[in-house]
Regions:
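Noncatalytic, basic helical substrate-engagement surface that gates or grips nucleic-acid strands
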Residues: 1-93, 112-114, 120
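Non-catalytic nucleic-acid-binding/docking modules located in mid-to-C-terminal regions
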Residues: 130-278
Length: 278
């Protein structure tokens, strides 16, 4: 459909994300324990579910993914910290059309356009259940959202902090979406909200979170180039190293090469047309 993907990899998580990382680690550890219990009971369905929940992304997996992308001729950027922040910068700079993510943090980091529910199957697995629901791609324009809400990006960040972000997962006690929006509309910023609403939370810590969203670590040193796929290297990685089905990989490679050549051909035709006009 003419989509040219650019992948962004997470770097080192910021210190202010420690609480969220600890929470996720505990979830994986609990799932791993329940997996072992399910295996002992012979409950294979539950074991499969808990195995998925306990899975961890390793450095080796990330490096393998990068090698495969290089072989496929697809560009990627290694973020120094949060991938969402790096992607938002790339979009804001005009080097990409939109961030594709399920995470609304993309908007807080300043991505001018966010696409959610971008899937091949058009379905999404429901958390903790063997059920799926149909989903349709959703596009959110940051400026349209801000205009509709009547707030600035900084105020959107403050609103999110009140509800809870990856850097303060629990948010402020007894404050939901509606109350958070009302507080921001009335008081304009975190600093001006009466302390009675903040339930003892340190305003300095909350402001630190806001500042991270506004000025996250990013790199400006990246290149975005699409190259012709190296079919032999793709097969070596997938078939020889990871035991993928050779026929399926060959078929996928044919489709990939065809897509690249059609893209390259249209690009060349566009240049030729431009030169003829000028």
């Amino acid at each position: 459909n003419g989509i040219k993907p650019l992948y962004v990899f997470d770097g080192k998580p910021p210190e202010i994300k420690a609480e969220e990382i600890a929470r996720r680690k505990k979830i994986r550890e609990d799932a791993s324990r329940k997996y072992e219990e399910s295996i002992k009971k012979g409950d294979l369905e539950s074991a499969r579910r808990y195995a998925m929940m306990s899975a961890k992304l390793t450095d080796e997996m990330v490096n393998d993914a990068k090698k495969l992308l290089e072989a496929m001729g697809l560009p990627y950027v290694q973020a120094p910290a949060e991938g969402e922040a790096q992607a938002a910068y790339i979009v804001r700079k005009g080097d990409a059309y939109a961030s594709a993510s399920q995470d609304y943090d993309s908007l807080l980091f300043g991505s001018t356009r966010l696409i959610r529910n971008l899937t091949i199957s058009g379905r999404r697995k429901l958390p903790g259940r063997e059920e799926y629901e149909e989903v349709k791609p959703e596009i959110i324009e940051l400026n349209l959202l801000l205009n509709k809400l009547g707030i600035t990006r900084e105020q959107l960040i403050d609103l999110a902090i009140l509800i809870g972000t990856d850097y303060n997962p629990d948010g402020i006690p007894n404050i939901g979406v509606k109350t958070a929006y009302q507080l921001i509309k009335q008081y304009k910023s975190l600093e001006k909200i009466p302390k009675t609403y903040l339930a003892g939370e340190s305003i300095d810590e909350l402001i630190k979170i806001r500042q991270y969203f506004l000025t996250p670590p990013i790199t400006v040193n990246y290149r975005i180039d699409w190259r012709e796929p190296d079919v032999n290297e793709i097969k070596r990685i997938l078939v020889e190293e990871h035991d993928f089905n050779s026929e399926r990989v060959s078929n996928a490679c044919e489709r990939l090469v065809k897509a690249y050549r059609e893209f390259f051909k249209s690009k060349q035709m566009g240049l030729e047309t431009w030169f003829k006009k000028n």
